[in-house]
Curated annotation (Swiss-Prot):
Annotated pathway: Secondary metabolite metabolism; methylglyoxal degradation; (R)-lactate from methylglyoxal: step 2/2
Organism in which the protein naturally occurs: Bartonella tribocorum (strain CIP 105476 / IBS 506)
Lineage: Bacteria, Pseudomonadati, Pseudomonadota, Alphaproteobacteria, Hyphomicrobiales
Cofactor: record remark: Binds 2 Zn(2+) ions per subunit.
Protein name from the UniProt record: Hydroxyacylglutathione hydrolase
Binding locations of Zn(2+) 1: 54, 56, 112, 131
InterPro entries (alphabetical): Clx_II_MBL, Glyoxalase_II_hydrolase, HAGH_C, Hydroxyacylglutathione_Hdrlase, Metallo-B-lactamas, RibonucZ/Hydroxyglut_hydro
Gene name of the encoded protein: gloB
Length: 253
């Protein structure tokens, strides 16, 4: 499977997935028509399918035009069918389906929105997490609760460490600076932050990254880490309390 990643709008990631065996191409979300058109033209691919992660405008704005031009079929969360225009097929929580020759899981990951989905290709170990999980961060809780988001992240953490993570936004630099305030002595985080700053200085993208690397560096996946709990003065707090405090601090960072 081939992947084309590019920047849309200001800081959205556009992602195209091409299944070589079937010749089919899918987009993860539809943030901007022009950038997606250009990427398809660059690779000489035709768009067949769009997988929507959630209903926010910056992820669905180009649906109408892409459907009109390519006659693409749009899949998205059943829980948000009344908020996403142009949906052709709805997906239930943790539904299994096929894209070309590849099996795909639509994982229910509420928190950022109540119906948010993350798409996982188990054979290729590829995760497209939308705005649920970012590199060194996670999505804001616009609709869901801290408990819901924590449970969603725990679900994603069960995937193999070698899984490659793609997400909805290039937020990694700011996330790295925040992560260092909570976990300043984490050498793996220090190395990742240095790498991120170097990449962004060259206007290069910071994803994909392995899930294993995120588990070692992302404070939103490290609610059990003794050093982070000590820095928060929350040694004996619950996972939910620690996660909620980290999210609160990031919101105000």
């Amino acid at each position: 499977m081939l992947i084309e990643q590019f920047i849309c709008r200001k800081d959205n990631f556009g992602v195209l997935i091409h299944d070589e065996k079937s010749g089919m191409t899918a987009a993860i979300d539809a943030p901007e028509s022009k950038a997606i058109h250009n990427a398809l033209k660059r690779r000489n691919w035709t768009l067949h399918t769009i997988f929507v992660t959630h209903h926010h405008h910056d992820h669905v704005e180009a649906l109408a035009e892409l459907k009109q031009v390519y006659n693409a079929i749009v899949f998205g969360p059943a829980a948000e069918k009344n908020k996403i225009y142009h949906l052709d097929q709805t997906l239930q929580s943790d539904e299994k389906l096929l894209f070309g020759s590849q099996s795909l899981l639509a994982l229910s990951t509420p928190g950022h929105t109540l119906g948010a989905l993350s798409y996982y290709f188990p054979e290729k170990k590829l995760l497209f997490a939308g705005d649920t999980l970012f590199s060194l961060g996670c999505g804001r809780l616009f609709e869901g609760t801290a408990v819901q988001m924590l449970n969603s992240l725990k679900k994603l953490c069960k995937l193999p460490d070698e899984t490659l993570l793609y997400c909805g936004h290039e937020y990694t630099k700011n996330n790295a600076l925040f992560a260092l305030t909570l976990d300043p002595h984490n050498q793996k985080l220090q190395q990742r932050a240095e790498e991120v700053l170097s990449l962004r200085a060259k206007n290069a993208m910071t994803l994909p990254v392995t899930l294993g690397q995120e588990k070692a560096t992302n404070p939103f996946l490290r609610w059990n880490d003794p050093a982070i709990r000590k820095n928060l003065s929350m040694k004996d707090s619950t996972d939910e309390e620690v996660f909620a405090e980290i999210r609160k601090r990031k919101d105000n960072f």
